[in-house]
């Protein structure tokens, strides 16, 4: 989650330090990153006050936008609620701030595939949902007069295959004597 865990300067801070107005919404490893409007990818647990997670690690100029939409963070009836929040925040930043560079991570499909595997029943639903969210962002750019000022990169962070069997590597390492307990180990997989 934490930007200060990175060993090199991230693209958000690099661009910000070069004088660009930079926004980032739910982009990985941005908690505490230096940018103009940063709302990090850091998720509160069920029942946890989202302010304790977001406020200390968002940029000061993004907090008002976060507060407008934080009520969407716990709509557990919608499996894609993090992307609803991210899109609402993104639309406001685009319309009100008009950043030079914008990073946005929509995670609906990735989250489903991590939980259910590559061949999921809800894949079409997730793709339709993401298509709608991208449409909302493009509409905001068009309304703000910035649509033709941006170049878009749509990325996936990894491929994925279905898992047929699991392998407990820490069990093997423990059996080999490399792990005694969680505090006494020579090798441990995470």
Residue ranges of each PLM-predicted region?
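Catalytic-core regions built around general acid/base machinery
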Residues: 11-14, 126-129, 133-145
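Active-site-proximal segments of metal-dependent phosphoesterases and phosphodiesterases across multiple
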Residues: 115-131
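N-terminal start-of-chain detector that recognizes signal peptides
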Residues: 73-77, 125-127, 167-171
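Secreted, luminal/periplasmic, and some membrane-associated catalytic domains
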Residues: 1, 121, 136-190
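His/Asp/Glu-rich, glycine-adjacent segments
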Residues: 1-117
């Amino acid at each position: 989650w934490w930007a200060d865990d990175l060993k090199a300067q991230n693209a958000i801070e690099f661009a910000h330090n070069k004088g660009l107005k930079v926004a980032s919404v739910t982009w990985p490893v941005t908690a505490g990153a230096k940018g103009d409007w940063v709302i990090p990818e850091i998720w509160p647990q069920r029942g946890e006050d989202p302010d304790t997670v977001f406020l200390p690690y968002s940029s000061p100029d993004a907090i008002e936008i976060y507060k407008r939409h934080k009520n969407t963070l716990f709509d557990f009836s919608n499996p894609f609620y993090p992307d609803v929040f991210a899109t609402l925040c993104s639309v406001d930043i685009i319309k009100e701030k008009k950043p030079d560079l914008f990073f946005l991570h929509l995670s609906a499909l990735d989250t489903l595939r991590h939980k259910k595997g590559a061949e999921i029943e809800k894949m079409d639903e997730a793709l339709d949902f993401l298509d709608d969210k991208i449409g909302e962002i493009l509409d905001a750019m068009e309304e703000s007069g910035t649509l033709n000022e941006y170049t878009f990169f749509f990325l996936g962070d990894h491929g994925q295959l279905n898992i047929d069997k699991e392998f407990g590597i820490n069990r093997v390492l423990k059996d080999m004597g490399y792990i005694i307990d969680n505090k006494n180990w020579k090798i441990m997989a995470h």
